[in-house]
Amino acid sequence: MYTLGEIAKTINAKLVGDANIEITGIATSLSANQTQLTYINGNKYKQMLINSKAGVVILNNNLLKNCPTNALVVDNVYLAFAKATHLFKKQTVHCQGTHSSAKINYAKIAPNCIIGKNVVIGNHCTIAPNVVIEDDVIIGNYTLIQPNVSILQGCSIGNNVVISPGVVIGSEGFGNAQDQQKHWYSIAHLGYVIIGSNVSIGANTTIDRGTIEDTQIHNGVQIDNLVHIAHNVIIGQDSAIAATVTIGGSCTIGKRCMIGGGATIASHISLVDDIIVTGASTVDKNLSEQGHYTGFTSINKHQKWKKIQVWLLNLDKIAHYLNIKLKELKGK
């Protein structure tokens, strides 16, 4: 918990409001309450600012007149937000063995495991050697955690989940802000990973925690080996993801989707329910209709690639036009 005055000093902001108000955490502009901080970066989000219930908003000067609450005024909003996240990041200190506050029901726990503060492990779980379970993790019943798995602070695992060797759940997402000198400043990720029941996660898969809200893997999802799931992703119930798939940040995958091996889904993409993506495809736009999708082209200079894409997208029209012209020529 920090006062607005302390936060303003940390992020080098001009404070407009009460310096003694205490802030307990960070939330999105839509969900923040009177004890939380949020940020608004750009005029297109002005209406969100006007409707905000946050205790304080990080913003730039041209939005100050629209702010209904306390404000932290800066030039680089995203950089200031990045600095603020580190104030609210919980730090985990690894103990040896099992912390005395952990609540472990009937479970088999192998040697060399680390189990942190306030961990809850359900009935009939099996924890293999060299597993790290950090503070505040909750694990349901009948879950199998195989060797060398790391489940990091605050994450939640449902019932009857299988987690294969080398999996990392709750690692920091890839989020950074740049300063004026183009130096990078990391964003501390404050969300968690929430995994439902009857989920299978293949070896060496990584699932990043959310930036502010949680990364979510719903019930029945099947994930193969070496899959990367970035921060803020939501994967719907009973979807299946084959090996080496990469899912970019803030994607939403619907229910019962099937993603073929080696496919890449770009950040901020949404797939509706019952989508099939062919292996090695690149998904760079929202898929709003059920169906089977395929797409991959060779790499080129970006400007050339964009021209090629325009031609490819219009090949049917071009072919139709050429057929008409060919018939006209034959008729002469």
Curated annotation (Swiss-Prot):
Report if keyword Nucleus is assigned. no
Q: Which CDD domains match?
A: LbH_LpxD
**Gene3D superfamilies per record:** Hexapeptide repeat proteins (2.160.10.10), MurE/MurF, N-terminal domain (3.40.1390.10)
Pathway note = Bacterial outer membrane biogenesis; LPS lipid A biosynthesis
Q: Which UniProt keywords apply?
A: Acyltransferase, Lipid A biosynthesis, Lipid biosynthesis, Lipid metabolism, Repeat, Transferase
Molecular function (GO) terms for this protein are:
N-acyltransferase activity
Look up the domain of life of the source.
Bacteria
Q: Which reaction does it catalyse?
A: a UDP-3-O-[(3R)-3-hydroxyacyl]-alpha-D-glucosamine + a (3R)-hydroxyacyl-[ACP] = a UDP-2-N,3-O-bis[(3R)-3-hydroxyacyl]-alpha-D-glucosamine + holo-[ACP] + H(+)
Q: Which GO terms describe its biological process?
A: lipid A biosynthetic process
Q: Which residues form the active site?
A: 231 (proton acceptor)
Write out the GO cellular component annotations.
membrane
The protein's role, per its UniProt record: Catalyzes the N-acylation of UDP-3-O-acylglucosamine using 3-hydroxyacyl-ACP as the acyl donor. Is involved in the biosynthesis of lipid A, a phosphorylated glycolipid that anchors the lipopolysaccharide to the outer membrane of the cell.
Q: Which family does it belong to?
A: Belongs to the transferase hexapeptide repeat family. LpxD subfamily.
Subunit description = Homotrimer.
> What PANTHER family does the database record attribute to this sequence?
UDP-3-O-ACYLGLUCOSAMINE N-ACYLTRANSFERASE (PTHR43378), UDP-3-O-ACYLGLUCOSAMINE N-ACYLTRANSFERASE 1, MITOCHONDRIAL-RELATED (PTHR43378:SF2)
Q: What is this protein called?
A: UDP-3-O-acylglucosamine N-acyltransferase
Recorded source organism is: Ruthia magnifica subsp. Calyptogena magnifica
